[in-house]
């Protein structure tokens, strides 16, 4: 095997064993448990976006969509980083809304703590993020007699035109966008490009997503989650019933950050979009105009596999949806992309 083949094989093994992708795989059991035969719940029923997307999307009588999302946080993270956990509770929900082509309206939270003092840094973190992103915290639930701190945060928003995980098509470009104006929140693989950044800049950077949707430049996107770039791409491809090839050599990353770590990173501002040839230059130009890193890293196809390459020197299959589901949210019937 060549050096590139050895490196790529190691990357594939590492990604398949990663906790980020494993956590996403847990979604499949939940989808099966909540689906009722005959009612279409597993595919979204009457809702605009099927189960498995970054937000639920409910059509509004007057047009547009009501968006709903929720995040829960690992207890160890909440215990070690209470202020940052509170901040992330708002930040990641805001990102989910924008990833769907929407704009946030309000946040609610569920916070359990040992007492009022233990809850304070979590509340302060949420308040700081709410001010940064101009999203009010309008209510929630609290329990100050718990044996530990636990946090979950939910959000609602509105979208005029959706970006979804279910509308990528074969023959499109996989485009990623990142904000490199940050640093790792050590020791975690969290690239923090939000705390301390100018709030006006953060909000304007996020506004690119609904503008791209409303201008008809793209219909499919996801925010890059704890599953990293490859894991997020897997979810997008599975939901759309397609495959892709991604060239890891084309993946932009901050100076000095090893590829292996960047592939495992939650980037705070990071999105993957599936874009037609006719619009790819316009989409990239919008991100770059705001000093955001943006690049085409791959091409979608009808093969229902995600294959990785390293500058064309090696090729390996990360996931074959013909053999194994990940989150279990593929189209109910095999998609005809002929």
Q: Positions of the model-derived regions?
A:
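Active-site-proximal betaalpha loop/short-helix elements
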Residues: 114, 201-268
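Beta-strand->loop->alpha-helix junctions that form or flank phosphate-binding loops
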Residues: 47-50, 143, 243-254, 284-311
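Small-aliphatic-rich amphipathic alpha-helix that forms the alpha element of a beta-alpha
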Residues: 81-108, 121-132, 207-213, 229-235
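Glycine-rich anion-binding loops of enzyme active sites
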Residues: 65-66, 73-75, 103-187, 299-301, ...
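Helix N-cap motif at beta-to-alpha junctions
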Residues: 274-281
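N-terminal glycine-rich phosphate/pyrophosphate-binding loops that anchor nucleotide-derived ligands
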Residues: 1-90, 94-99, 135, 172-173
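General beta-strand structural signal in soluble alpha/beta enzymes
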Residues: 47-51, 59, 67-69, 136-140, ...
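Acidic, Ser/Thr/Pro-rich beta/coil linker or hinge segments at domain junctions
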Residues: 2-14, 22, 26, 290-338
């Amino acid at each position: 095997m060549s050096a590139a083949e050895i490196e790529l094989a190691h990357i594939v093994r590492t990604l398949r064993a990663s906790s980020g992708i494993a956590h996403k795989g847990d979604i499949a059991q939940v989808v099966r448990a909540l689906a009722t035969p005959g009612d279409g719940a597993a595919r979204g029923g009457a809702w605009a976006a099927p189960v498995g997307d970054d937000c639920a999307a409910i059509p509004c009588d007057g047009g547009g969509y009501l968006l709903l999302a929720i995040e829960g946080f690992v207890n160890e993270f909440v215990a070690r980083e209470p202020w940052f956990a509170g901040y992330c509770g708002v930040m990641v929900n805001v990102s989910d809304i924008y990833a769907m082509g929407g704009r946030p309206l309000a946040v609610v939270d569920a916070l359990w703590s040992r007492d009022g003092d233990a809850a304070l840094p979590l509340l302060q973190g949420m308040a700081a993020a709410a001010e940064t992103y101009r999203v009010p915290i309008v209510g929630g639930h609290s329990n100050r007699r718990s044996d530990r701190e636990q946090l979950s945060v939910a959000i609602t928003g509105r979208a005029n035109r959706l970006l979804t995980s279910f509308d990528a098509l074969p023959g499109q470009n996989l485009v990623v966008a990142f904000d490199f104006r940050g640093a790792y929140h050590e020791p975690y693989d969290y690239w923090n490009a939000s705390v301390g950044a100018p709030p006006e800049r953060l909000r304007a950077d996020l506004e690119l997503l609904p503008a791209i949707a409303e201008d008809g430049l793209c219909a499919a996107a996801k925010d890059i989650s704890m599953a990293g770039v490859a894991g997020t791409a897997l979810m997008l491809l599975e939901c759309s019933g397609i495959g892709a090839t991604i060239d890891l050599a084309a993946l932009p990353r901050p100076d000095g950050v090893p590829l292996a770590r960047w592939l495992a990173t939650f980037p705070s501002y990071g999105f993957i979009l599936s874009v037609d040839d006719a619009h790819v230059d316009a989409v990239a130009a919008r991100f770059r105009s705001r000093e955001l890193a943006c690049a085409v890293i791959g091409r979608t196809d009808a093969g229902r596999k995600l294959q990785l390459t390293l500058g064309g020197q090696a090729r390996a299959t990360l996931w074959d949806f013909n053999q194994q589901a990940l989150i279990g949210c593929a189209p109910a019937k095999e998609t005809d992309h002929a």
